[in-house]
């Protein structure tokens, strides 16, 4: 995996690719390398901020807000360059994401907090991510793992187009040859599995860890 990105179609002429900051340079290199006849121009931007809003539930249902599917809505009555979309983390845990100009950061944060949104610090979000087995960031998205090991089969299109690694991933899936899997373990109760051959912790907090383990060592 080079990275997993979200694409925001702002208009017919402009797409925003949201990527992991630490994977940015490698991602740009690969896009440039495999862009041939298409008229695509990449411009790096650090002008936007992205906020995920979510609940403990995996699904979000709206009663008074029309945001179907993953359509992007733009709000320009109060803020300029403010976009909102219903989407999900990479484990399909649904979120509502806000994308906006960084100059609005303090104002947007204050509005959300005034509406009883709770802000998670890095440690709390890390624990949430581990508990829900959400691959997120360079620890999971790197050249050491393939999408099937990270439970990302829902992001793979086995029919559309022709892309690097497509044939390898298709064979792994068709013949059930994926040997590893990303799971969550309690660090105290699972010492043997954590220390088993081929296991690799990707993220951890005080009590639990998200770890790649060989499937033969777990009951599936």
Annotate each PLM feature.
Residues 6-135:
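Acidic, low-complexity central loop/insert segments
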Residues 1, 5, 122, 126-128, ...:
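Glycine-rich, small/acidic residue-mixed loop/short-helix segments
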